[in-house]
Amino acid sequence: MTYRPDIDGLRAVAVIAVILFHLNTNWLPGGFLGVDIFFVISGYLIGGILYRELSTGTFSLKRFYLRRMRRILPAFFAVVVFTLIVGAQLMVPGSDEWNTARSSAKWSVFFGGNFFSALNTDYFAPTVEVQPLNHLWSLAVEEQFYFIYPLILWAIMGIIKRILPPASSSLTRCVNVVLTALAIASFALAFLPISLHGTALVPYYLPHLRFGELLIGAILAVAVAQGNLQPSAKTATFVGSLSILVLIACLVLPFPNTTPWFPGFAAALPCIASAGIIYAGARPYWFASALSHRAVVFVGKISYSLYLWHWPLLAFAHYALGRELSNTVLAATALLIVLLSLASYHLIEQPLRHLQWSFGRTGLVYYLLPTLLVAGLYMQGRKMPTEMEQFVSCGVPRGTEKVLTYTTIGKQNNTPNVLIVGNSYTIQLRDFFDKVAKAEGWCGILSGVSGTFPHHLEKQKPISREEFQKIYDNISLTGDWDKELNNLRSQRIISDLPKFKTIIISLNWWHPETYSKALPEVLSTIGFLHKQGKHIIVVNSCMSYNTARLAETYCSVRQKTVTLSALQSENYLRGTAYHLGENRVQATKQAINTRFPQVEWLDLVPFIPHSLLHNGKSILCNPTHINIYGANYLADRFIESGQHLIAPVPSSHSR
């Protein structure tokens, strides 16, 4: 294939779009589509090579993957190793962020990082900004495509050649009809949601929804392979100009990024525009000339290194500072991205790409040995220092661990007569309730199941402790296991309900789903408990804050100096999400008090310090949960205030 400098120029457009979007989403709202441009370019270049080699009988699967290893692996492993080494020093051992980085590295070396992301991360969620290897999802998708596409194309061409007469000129047309059908099917599959063990997969990362984008490039490559689909100068100018206008509009304007349209049929628009630019670039016209400028081409040549290095550096900056990055920090980070990318391109990517080693030696040095190094780094720092646990944990097990908390708190020699019930926002307050109960001289049962609230108690049947334990042990982490846990918890509650005089309900009242979906169930449960003569207290314990990074906590524990002036701004800490949540909390309080004026309301948010810090240490383990240290701090503040959670004579007024 003749070298096309304009295609390297288009690579430059793609990588700049992605980096600008990640620097600040407002700068280029559709910048995430740069990845889709990369997919089209890849499909065109590699798809074209595959088609020509299969057509001439010169294709070798071994040679194909040898080229892929030389092209992809050296810089890829350099970034993964760098990320694990830096992450081990910067991130809190055992924290969600560090565990996610390690797991992402593990999945990525097997080119399955997109599946890990699909199980855990919304691409557009704020939490992504501190996940340093999340961007490797696109590389995984591309490699998954090339694991199967050579075989699919070989099969398609073989079948068509058997059907058509020898030397038929219809081969190209027939191949493209099949590839087009596959591309349309890929986009259409976005209308079929997929879940694994009851967990919905994030469509953004799924390969079968992205293969259509690579196929658009491959379809163009097949169409032009015979040399009879070359544009005239006039056609090139028209198609190229129209395509660049469409692509600019997609990048500059807010682009739909939700299922089922993206990924899906909406992605076809920027992809077809990218293919149009590639098609038109076969003839010199104004934009092809601009893309072929030496400076633009050079950016395109180092685009792979730029893409690999930009996200870990930005993620570490977000993590270390725990706040929105200033323009000065962004500029410094951008400079570091360029410098590391240049070093990577000249010292790693290019020298190792051109070593003419055998397939076995290349696989050993480029893949197996680096994978063993990553495995060694993965095994390091797995345990959290004991002194860190109270800052990093909110008492809620991470991941999909089966958890049903049903534990005694408070004065242990008393009979439990208080039930504290809810989800993770109940579990996070275990130390708060335990310390307050001991100070007030009562004993209770704390029951929490992450993400759920007991409902339909009136329909539950009592269950013995033996039955409870047997059912619990047999619940497997498949299907709707969380609902099974909640149902089992409800049965346990109804069994013990007669001995409880007071019921305390603690949920994430600020969350939109709690307000829209869970509140009717809560009101129904309160009504049932009220009929049973129970004294009911509703607790609001936390909100959604703009920051709760653990970097400042980690530095404080290590006795390092930390500048937290940027965290002192109430406007920053308590942003849009906080104020919207505050409105939902007040609406919830009003809804409960309107129907059940005798229900008490205890708001712990006023006890949370303005800076979210106490003695220089964070009281939150993430933007929405109090850590163990914070729960003890709130208990001390509450006790010092002179208030009572369980007063000697239950009060009928709202706290």
Task: Annotate each language-model stretch with its function.
Residues 1-357, 654:
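Membrane-interface helix/loop caps of multi-pass membrane proteins
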Residues 256-258, 320-331, 335-342, 346, ...:
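Extracellular/periplasmic envelope-modification machinery, especially enzymes
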